[in-house]
Amino acid sequence: MRKLVLSSFIAVLLSGCATAHQQTEQEKALVGDWICHVKPAAKSPLPVEHFDYVTYRVDQTVLLRGISQIDTKEGWMRYLLQAKAKWQASDGKLSYDFTDRLFKTAHSPQVAKIIEQSPEFKELDKEFVSPCSNCGDHLDMKIKMKSPTRMTSFNTYTKETSQCRKLSAGEKTKEVKLIEKLVEEKGSI
């Protein structure tokens, strides 16, 4: 009887191991915290800059926290994106299947007041927030590892290329600190 129970237990353990996701080399390289930056396009009528603080976990979940900001003479118009997703990477392709997402304004009180009083800024604010409602639950990106701590990613939805750097353990850049501050102020998902 003991042998039967023991062999059944071992069989269950082995079958669980067989179905576990085997990480690709690219996935192993991605695990950790990254900061990514998209500079505004030189000739863009709307110079939007993005910073993303991305945490890739071994269990194939990812936590994205980012800001998009528009520099105006009145101050920064800021938007906060937070998302949770399942991720996979291989052969230069990174994909996300979103499980939760939150996109909200993160303007300073002064800038929010100016936006409220300006029809032009109000329309711009509305226009900027609305496209995310059509983002879908799946995103594919093309990635190129330049080194173990540097990569570029091309977002196939926004057609933007970001430059990414892997953060060392405990490292907090000024952009990461700003993102964490905004998440704390605005609430996390």
Question: Language-model segments: what does each one mean?
Answer:
Residues 1-4:
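Positively charged n-region of N-terminal signal peptides that target proteins for export
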Residues 7-15:
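Bacterial N-terminal signal peptides
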